[in-house]
């Protein structure tokens, strides 16, 4: 498995050329690169030579070494969400690499810094939502691998304000999934307003998001019951710190089983699966005064909660999107301090179409990460 060596921190003067007035590594940035691109939703995923993007004055250019593969990438390719994608599009929003160039207005970054590309590539930073640190809700949010070419390429741009700061010496392959999956589930767990010792159910516990959610929940002091299908997935959940596991393919009464394990229902439920049925079941087994957090985004899904039960049990149902800059810093710190590990499988970027097939079939344990060098 390829591992990154230290980047040279040699900075050239501001210069004009193919990339305008920017600061770059003394070694030249190439004009072309390898990437995976599609020209229509659901169209062929082409691994080919494409131009290296030019960073704007407020952007950094990152030499992406590794990128996680997220279920959102599948939706972007299919185009089955209400928000239209940029076309043609390079997907990906979990890119980890090295800063090799910076726009003339960028401050606080150095050539050679480790940096990450998140789902939120940039925002206006002046609207009500941005002022309250809810940048992901900005009406002008720019989304990596959706409205902005993402990390399934060797070089990608990111707004210098939103790019994730990764500590030097970090394993870039393992940290890649933290940039979206890790931040997303960490924010969701915070949104559940739990306290140490509380039970939390993770629906979709063995997948890319779920496998990280189990670990973050454990590190935050919660008791975890994982929900997923299959013996192999149950073993993974237990290995990652889950106290109990419910196999939805075998249980006769999932609601009753979860409530029995948790002595009345979990205090919080984090729904990271893309199952509408699983989301609706969570409103039934959550503990009175508990919180159901919706994270997974199955196309066209509707969550239903029986009103009498909802009111009498005084439950909360809320959505949780990606985290802000503080959430990102905290989520990365959990990883850097060894509290969270990414169960990953690394394959070449050229194999991305095969990864999409496995994802569609629900056959992925943990997270796939692509190595952009092949």
Swiss-Prot record:
Cellular component annotations (GO), alphabetically ordered: mitochondrial matrix
Gene: ADH3
Matching CDD domains: CAD3
Residue range of the transit peptide in the UniProt record, numbered on this chain: 1-26
GO MF annotation: an example: zinc ion binding
Binding locations of Zn(2+) 2: 124, 127, 130, 138
Signal peptide positions on this chain: none
UniProt binding sites for Zn(2+) 1: 70, 93, 180
Stated name of the protein: Alcohol dehydrogenase 3, mitochondrial
A matching Pfam family: ADH_zinc_N
Catalytic activity: a primary alcohol + NAD(+) = an aldehyde + NADH + H(+); a secondary alcohol + NAD(+) = a ketone + NADH + H(+)
Cofactor dependence: Zn(2+)
